[in-house]
UniProtKB/Swiss-Prot annotation:
Functional description taken from the UniProt entry: McdA and McdB together mediate carboxysome positioning on the nucleoid and to prevent their aggregation in the cell. Undergoes liquid-liquid phase separation at pH 7.0 in the presence of crowders polyethylene glycol or Ficoll. McdA is an ATPase that forms dynamic gradients on the nucleoid in response to adapter protein McdB, which associates with carboxysomes. The interplay between McdA gradients on the nucleoid and McdB-bound carboxysomes result in the equal spacing of Cbs along the cell length. Stimulates the ATPase activity of McdA, causing McdA to be released from DNA. Incorrect positioning (aggregation) of carboxysomes results in reduced CO(2) fixation by encapsulated form 1 ribulose-1,5-bisphosphate carboxylase (RuBisCO, cbbL/cbbS), which leads to slower growth.
Protein species of origin: Halothiobacillus neapolitanus (strain ATCC 23641 / c2)
Name recorded for this polypeptide: Maintenance of carboxysome distribution protein B
Ranges annotated as biased composition (Low complexity): 59-74
Complex and partners: Monomer, associates with McdA:DNA. Interacts with shell components of the carboxysome.
Keywords, sorted A to Z: Bacterial microcompartment, Carbon dioxide fixation, Carboxysome
Length: 96
């Protein structure tokens, strides 16, 4: 069992050395620093590219309930009763 533990610890030590070695080397200068320094990043207050122009809201279905089918008989509030027209049959008034 100790032989297996020794191999495992040895492999861990070599992995640690591999990960530490590249980090200890000095960092190379960035590739874009070789570009001419006359080009400057845009410092204007332009809108970010991700923002889009204002759009009209998309029309969505406003009804969440299914349409209710009307019955053949209208309700009492919907019935239209014709007004009594007295012009064709005026009330008869008897003279005194």
């Amino acid at each position: 069992m100790t032989n297996l533990e020794d191999k495992l610890s040895a492999s861990i030590k070599t992995e640690n050395k591999d990960t530490i070695a590249p980090a200890s080397t000095p960092a190379k200068p960035a590739a874009r620093s070789a570009a001419p320094e006359t080009t400057k990043p845009a410092s204007t207050g332009a809108k970010p590219a991700t923002r889009t122009a204002a759009k009209k809201p998309v029309a969505r279905a406003t009804t969440t309930k299914p349409a209710v089918s009307k019955s053949s008989k209208p309700s009492a509030d919907d019935i239209q009763v014709p007004a009594h027209d007295t012009s064709t049959h005026p009330r008869r008034v008897w003279p005194d």
